[in-house]
C-alpha cells in the first residue's frame, strides 16, 4: 500500500504514526510545504488522547520531556456563568463515591440554590488537586495512565514523532501544485511539477483543505458563540 499524507504538523505526523502502526509494510510519504510553517501553539488534550497514544506505543517518559509536556487532570472554567463568577473544575476520571441516582444530588443542589459545579469539588479529588497543581496519585479511583490528558508544544511533538516514530516514513518538502480526480477518487498529485500516485491520501492541511477542494460554508449566522476561553489546570 502506498499512502500520501499532505501536510505535516502534529496532525500530519500523528496520521503517519497511526498508519505506520496499522500498516507497517506500507510505503508512507508526508508532504510538507516549504511555505507553510506548522502552527506553533500549545496543545491541550483530554484523557481520550491516551487511547491513541497507547495504540501507537507512546511512553510518557520518552516523549513528554522532549515536548515540554505536563499532565492535565481537569479543565478550569472562569467567568463561565457570569462575569467574575467563581471558577469551576471539570475533572477527569471517576468520582470518589458510587452514585446510584445522581439526579437526586442535582435536585437537592437546585433546591438549596447551589451551583452544580459544586458536585465536582465535593466528589472528585482531582478537582481539588487541580487547584493546587497536584496529582491525586494516592487516590485509588485515579489512574495516571488513564485519567490524564496533556499540555505540550505541538511543534516539538510533531518533530518528535517524525524523528522517533516515523524513521521509515518518506518526507517530501514541496508544493502540491494540482491533483487529478477520476470520479470521486484522487488519482494523481502534482508536487513541484512531478506526478505522484498513491492508494490512499490524507489531507492534513487544516482549514486550507487542499485535497477536499470544497467551498467554505459560513455558519456564523447560526452559531452565536464566536469566542471561547478557558483556563486549563494541570
Over which residues does each language-model region extend?
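Single conserved hydrophobic/aromatic residue that forms the stacking wall/gate
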Residues: 224-234
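Dinucleotide-binding Rossmann-like beta1-alpha1 core, especially the glycine-rich loop
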Residues: 41-131
Amino acid at each position: 500500500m502506498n499512502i500520501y499524507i499532505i501536510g505535516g504538523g502534529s496532525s500530519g505526523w500523528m496520521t503517519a504514526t497511526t498508519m505506520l502502526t496499522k500498516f507497517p509494510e506500507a510505503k508512507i510519504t508526508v508532504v510538507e510545504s516549504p511555505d507553510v510553517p506548522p502552527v506553533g501553539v500549545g496543545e491541550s488534550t483530554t484523557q481520550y488522547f491516551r487511547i491513541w497514544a497507547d495504540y501507537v506505543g507512546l511512553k510518557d517518559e520518552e516523549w513528554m520531556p522532549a515536548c515540554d509536556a505536563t499532565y492535565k487532570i481537569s479543565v478550569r472554567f472562569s467567568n463561565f456563568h457570569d462575569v467574575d463568577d467563581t471558577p469551576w473544575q471539570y475533572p477527569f476520571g471517576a468520582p470518589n463515591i458510587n452514585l446510584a441516582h445522581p439526579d437526586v444530588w442535582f435536585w437537592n443542589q437546585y433546591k438549596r440554590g447551589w451551583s452544580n459545579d459544586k458536585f465536582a469539588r465535593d466528589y472528585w479529588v482531582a478537582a481539588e488537586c487541580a487547584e493546587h497543581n497536584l496529582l491525586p496519585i494516592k487516590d485509588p479511583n485515579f489512574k495516571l495512565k488513564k485519567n490524564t490528558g496533556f499540555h505540550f508544544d505541538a511543534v516539538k511533538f510533531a518533530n518528535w514523532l517524525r524523528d522517533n516514530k516515523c524513521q521509515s516514513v518518506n518526507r517530501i518538502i514541496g508544493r502540491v501544485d494540482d491533483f487529478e480526480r477520476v470520479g470521486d477518487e484522487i488519482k494523481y498529485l502534482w508536487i513541484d511539477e512531478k506526478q505522484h500516485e498513491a492508494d490512499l491520501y490524507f489531507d492534513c492541511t487544516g482549514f486550507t483543505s487542499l485535497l477536499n477542494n470544497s467551498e467554505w460554508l459560513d455558519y456564523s449566522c447560526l452559531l452565536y458563540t464566536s469566542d471561547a476561553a478557558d483556563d486549563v489546570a494541570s
